Regions:
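Small/polar, glycine/serine/threonine/aspartate-rich low-complexity segments that form flexible
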Residues: 40-45, 90-123, 127, 240-251, ...
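A short glycine-centered flexible hinge/capping loop motif at secondary-structure junctions
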Residues: 188-192, 385-389, 426-428
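Bacterial Sec-pathway N-terminal export signals of envelope proteins
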Residues: 16-86, 234, 240-276, 339-342, ...
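Sec-dependent bacterial lipoprotein signal peptides
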Residues: 1-14
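Acidic, low-complexity, intrinsically disordered peripheral segments
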Residues: 17-21, 408-445
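Periplasmic alpha-helical coiled-coil/stalk elements that build and connect Gram-negative outer-membrane
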Residues: 18, 124, 140-260, 352-355, ...
Length: 445
């Protein structure tokens, strides 16, 4: 059996991969996500809340699953990169010649695959680490895609809620314009107003009616966009929300939020993993100076046993130098891309924080001062009109001012929520707890 020990060693070496440290943990994370994705998907209720839409989108969004499978594909490249070449078994049989047994006429051989030399283990380890960093980057991009889906669902839900407010405000405006038209018609009949006043009132009501119909038509477009995120048919019924989602507070100062941007951004983290992978690629290019080798072992019956080997001399000095410089340039490009991404993220954060704080200030002004004042003026005009001391035009003007203030407040709240979603997405923040949101936490939100 000892004559086959070398052959057995070659076979075992060919079957083993050099697994980098951290691969098992990355695979465990991917397996945990797979169990989440394969769980039974929740059903969307007839009148879904924002939380219902978020839960359904996690299971149904195809883009999120595509990112997951890209992550798994990157993980499966690790053993491919970190494995030695295949072994080749050869067989030959000698015909004719002196009297020999069948075994002595037989030659068995094992060698590395032709055209694929055996790299030293350090090369395989470096290649495995490079593939692991690429897999980690893919995993972080899945994380970014998860928060991207959450952001798109939140944004579209806010758009739907704002659309519901716009439809309600437009309906009340139509009622007011109908009242104004009725008063204008009465005044024309009484001879106290020209016909032009009635025509103007009718035109205003017709334009408002057309705008109302346009708003109802836009509902189908917004619903189709949300249905796409939820993995439903584009024309599946989706009612408008009954109210704007409650405002969520952003804890911490602006300086703290800006600091978190660079620390928790999944895109920056993915770029950092790509930089680490390029560093391993540079090490792999330098390792081309280390010769690869080949081994062979042959047994000719009971007559002879031979062990052979070969070595590849790294004489292509300029080619190796070029590969090293290419890897170094690629590393510098990845570092520059990461630095620019950090700068762009910081700039976008300054903008989003400005939008958020400015909308907060304006919303507070409308909520505490302008809207109550406009509603008080509308109630006063209504009381004056009921007492016969005011006109319908005055009532309509006062009430429409209150409706405009109500719509402006809803728009400010929607803009603030979108700015908060952008901050939340880039930093993986749970604004209620100010910590990274885990996958399980997000499912239950």
């Amino acid at each position: 059996m000892r004559r086959f020990s070398a052959a057995t060693t070659l076979l075992l070496a060919a079957a083993c991969a050099v697994h980098p440290r951290g691969e098992r943990e990355e695979r465990d994370r991917a397996d945990a996500v797979a169990r989440e994705l394969d769980a039974e998907a929740p059903t969307l209720p007839d009148a879904p809340t924002l939380e219902d839409c978020l839960r359904v989108a996690f299971y149904a969004n195809a883009d999120l699953r595509a990112r997951y499978w890209e992550w798994r594909a990157a993980l499966e490249r690790i053993p491919q990169e970190a494995s030695p070449p295949n072994a080749v078994l050869s067989f030959s049989y000698l015909f004719g010649g002196p009297q020999m047994t069948a075994w002595d006429r037989t030659t068995l051989g094992i060698a590395n695959e032709p055209g694929a030399m055996i790299p030293v283990p350090s090369k395989l380890a470096t290649a495995g680490r490079r593939a692991l960093e690429e897999a980690r980057a893919a995993g972080l991009r899945f994380e970014a895609a998860k928060f991207g889906v959450q952001a798109r669902v939140r944004t579209r839900y806010v758009d739907l809620a704002l659309h519901a407010v716009m439809i309600e405000v437009q309906k009340e405006s139509l009622d007011l314009l109908a009242l104004a038209e009725g008063e204008a018609a009465a005044r024309v009949r009484a001879g106290t107003a020209p016909m032009q006043e009635l025509l103007a009132a009718r035109s205003a009501r017709d334009l408002a009616q057309s705008e109302s119909e346009s708003l109802h038509g836009q509902h189908a477009t917004l619903a189709a966009e949300m249905n796409a995120l939820l993995g439903r048919a584009a024309d599946a019924p989706l009612p408008l929300p009954t109210a704007m989602p409650p405002s969520r507070e952003l804890p911490g100062t602006d300086a703290e939020i800006l600091a978190l941007a660079g620390e928790r951004s999944p895109e920056i983290a993915a770029l950092s993993r790509e930089v680490a992978g390029r560093e391993e690629a540079l090490e792999l290019a330098r390792a081309q100076r280390i010769p690869d080798f080949g081994l062979s072992f042959d047994v000719m019956g009971s007559a002879t046993q031979s062990l052979g080997g070969m070595i590849v001399l790294p004489l292509r000095v300029e080619a190796i130098r070029g590969a090293i410089e290419e890897a170094r340039a690629s590393l510098r490009a990845a570092e520059a891309a990461r630095e620019q991404a950090r700068r762009d993220l910081a700039a976008s954060f300054v903008l989003e924080l400005y939008v958020l704080r400015n909308d907060e200030r304006q919303a507070a002004l409308f909520e505490s001062v302008l809207l109550p004042r406009a509603e008080l003026a509308a109630r006063t005009a209504a009381a004056t009109f009921a007492a016969g001391r005011g006109t319908a035009s005055e009532l309509v003007a006062a009430r429409r001012t209150a409706l405009d203030a109500r719509l402006a407040l809803a728009e400010l709240r929607a803009q603030r929520e979108k700015a908060l979603v952008a901050i939340e997405t880039s930093t993986k923040l749970d604004v209620e707890a100010l910590h990274p949101v885990s996958l399980g936490d997000w499912r239950g939100r």
